[in-house]
C-alpha cells in the first residue's frame, strides 16, 4: 500500500504543478486587456477552449494551449498508423514499435504547438494584448507557449509512468473540474439577479446527476458473448471444459470520440475567432459565431465527428478477424457459430451494433444537456462533454487503483506463501 500512496502522492504533486503553471503568464502580456476580451467572449467557442485549458487561456499563461496540440498529434498518428505501411510495421514490433510511434507523436505535438502558438501570438499582437509588437517579442511568446506545451506533455507521461491513471486524461479532467465552481457561481449569480429561476437551476442539477448516472451505467455495462472450449481428454473419458464469455463494452470507444470531436471543432473555430479581428477577415468572425456551442452548425458537425470517430476508433482498435483467430487458436468457439469466417462475421455484427449504440449514446450525452443549458442561458461548463470526460476519467482511475491494490495483495500472498514454504523445508 505504501507504493500506492507514493503514486497517488506523485499524481497530486504533478496536478498541483500543472495548476501553478496555469497562473504563469506569457512574457509581455497585458492581463487587463485579456480579461476584458474574455469578458466579451462568454458563451463562445473561446470560452469552451478556455475550459480545456483550465483557465490558462484566459490568463494567457504558458499552458494556454493545454494538451490540445498533443491530442491533435495523437489523432493524426492514429489515422496514419492504420494507413501508412511503415507505421503499420512499427505497430507489429511490440514495445519498441510503440515507443517509436510515441516519439513521432511528440514531434507532432511540437509542430502543432508551433502552429497554434504562432497563430495565437499574431492575434494577440494585432489586438494589442502583447506590450511588445516586435518580432523578438513574438518569438519569446511563441517559445514560452511551446515550452509550456512540451512540459505539459512530459508531465502527463510522468503521471502515467510514476503516478497512476492516464496522465493526459487526468490533466483534461482537472482542467474541467476547476471550472465547475465558477459555473455554479455564475448560475447562482443569475438566480440572484432574477435572470434564472431557482426551479430551473434545480432541474439542471438533477439533469447533471442523471447524466452522471447514465455515464456510470453505460461505461460499466458489457455485452457478453458466450464462449465454450473444446472437450479435453482425461483418463476416465471426455470432460467438457467450463464455458466462459467474451466481454465487450457497450461504449467501445470510451470518451475518445468526444475529445477528438471537441478538439477538431476547437481548432478551426478558434482560428476563425482569432483571425476574424484582423482587417479584411471579418467573414471569419461571422463563421466563428456559427461554431459557438449550441448553434445548429456546431451541433451538426459535432454529431458527425462523434459518429465518424466512433467508427474510426473501432476500426483502429478492434479487429473481428483477430478475435476469431485468437479464439480458434485457444480452442474456443461461440455456440452455434463455426470457427473462422463465420465467427469473425458474427463478432463484426456485434461490434457494428455496439458502435451504433456508442455513437448514439455519446451524441445524446454531449448534445442534449448542451441544448437545454443554452436554452436557459447558462454557461456550458456543465455541458455533457465535460461531465462525460470527468466521469469516464474518474472511473478509469478507480479501476486502475483497484487493479493495483489487487496486484499488491496477490504479491503479498505469494511472498508469504514462499516464506512459509521455505520455513517448512528448513524444518525437514
What are the residue ranges of the model-derived segments?
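N-terminal cationic and glycine-rich segments that engage phosphates or anionic surfaces
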Residues: 2-91, 96-428
